[in-house]
């Protein structure tokens, strides 16, 4: 699917080669990252918006597609967010996109300069439309070095933007922000890698706090499904069949890039005790949103048991319990009948070598 780019601009944040960070003038942020006020950064501002060319639209389409595939968190603006105040002036047409982008670039540079990991980057701001929804995309992209061969077959060094691998980006659903100011999901951001807090400064730049938690929502959904089956007095086999229906629906939504719609999900599974699942979930107050971003790792537990520890990793389909796999709680054992062929082959070869 294509996107429609309305406005786009690039600015640069440059860390001069001579910039030094004194080791004795650092302090710890709340997130445990080293911060400093002495990182020297320069902001190079483009003097006009980029023309909306085929190249600009392709550039933004690739960024959009890459962002869609990222693991994202959800956020909301803080009351005193300077970025949100500037954005509001833009949306109220009190300022234009270019001066808004200047404010944002300077604000980002000021926030980034506090950190020891500050590096150069290209700051991208783009307002675009996708599936009848207006978005503001914001990212800080790294440049990579490479080589190219010209028409004379001469080799030259070049720089290119790394638009497939980036960690510092956010997107604001302007349509949602306009029609539902109390939404807890109009802002999305890339969740940083485990153990890294580099992306946190970007949230500080935006003046945003985390909003909707997809992991918690998925866990609450699983609990609601389990309770629904229990209240319906289903057998273990019947419960597992319902859970598989839920998993198949959720898997389909993931593959389509869509969210879990609670009402739609409710229509795909049996009605128990004359009460649809959606009504049951609302009545029991699980705190579920009408639309839930699916988390694949959490949803797997609908159809699988898995665990690891002390050098052992086990994963099997839930429907095999009490059929081929038996659990003895008192003895703390699992008995497996019918080992996987490749595992059995490895064990037989080991036994043969020992003999």
Curated annotation (Swiss-Prot):
Coiled-coil region list: none
Keyword terms of this UniProt record: Cytoplasm
Paired cysteines (S-S): none
InterPro entries noted in UniProt: Nucleoid_associated_NdpA
Subcellular compartments: Cytoplasm, Nucleoid
Protein name: Nucleoid-associated protein MS1911
HAMAP family from the UniProt entry: NdpA
Keyword set includes Nucleus: no
Naturally occurring in which organism (per UniProt): Mannheimia succiniciproducens (strain KCTC 0769BP / MBEL55E)
GO molecular function, one term: double-stranded DNA binding
Keyword Iron among record annotations: no
Region (Insert): 21-40
Cellular component per GO, a single term: bacterial nucleoid
Similarity comment text for this entry: Belongs to the YejK family.
């Amino acid at each position: 699917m294509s996107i429609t780019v309305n406005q786009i601009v690039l600015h640069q944040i440059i860390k001069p080669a001579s910039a030094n960070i004194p080791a004795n003038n650092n302090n710890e942020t709340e997130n445990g990252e080293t911060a400093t006020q002495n990182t020297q950064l320069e902001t190079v501002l483009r003097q006009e918006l980029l023309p909306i060319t085929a190249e600009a639209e392709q550039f933004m389409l690739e960024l959009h597609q890459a962002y869609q595939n990222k693991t994202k968190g959800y956020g909301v603006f803080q009351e005193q967010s300077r970025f949100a105040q500037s954005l509001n002036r833009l949306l109220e047409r009190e300022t234009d996109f270019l001066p808004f982008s200047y404010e944002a670039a300077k604000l980002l540079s000021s926030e980034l300069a506090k950190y020891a990991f500050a590096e150069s980057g290209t700051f991208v701001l783009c307002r675009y439309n996708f599936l009848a929804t207006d978005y503001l995309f914001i990212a800080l992209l790294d440049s990579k070095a490479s080589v190219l061969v010209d028409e004379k077959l001469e080799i030259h060094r070049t720089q290119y933007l790394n638009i497939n691998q980036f960690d510092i980006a956010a997107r604001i659903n302007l349509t949602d922000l306009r029609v539902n100011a109390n939404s807890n999901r109009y802002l999305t951001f890339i969740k940083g890698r485990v153990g890294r807090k580099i992306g946190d400064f970007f949230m500080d730049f935006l003046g945003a706090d985390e909003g909707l938690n997809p992991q918690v929502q998925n866990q609450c959904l699983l609990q609601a499904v389990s309770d629904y089956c229990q209240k319906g007095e289903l057998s273990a086999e019947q419960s597992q069949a319902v859970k598989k229906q839920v998993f198949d629906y959720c898997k389909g939504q993931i593959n389509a890039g869509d969210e879990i719609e609670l009402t739609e999900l409710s229509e795909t599974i049996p009605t128990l005790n004359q009460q649809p699942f959606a009504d049951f979930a609302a009545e029991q107050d699980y705190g579920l949103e009408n639309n839930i971003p699916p988390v694949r790792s959490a949803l797997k537990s609908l159809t699988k048991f898995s665990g690891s520890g002390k050098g052992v990793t086990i994963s099997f389909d839930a429907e095999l319990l009490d059929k081929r796999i038996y659990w003895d709680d008192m003895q703390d054992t699992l008995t497996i009948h019918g080992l996987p062929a490749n595992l059995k082959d490895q064990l037989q070869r080991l036994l043969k070598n020992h003999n």
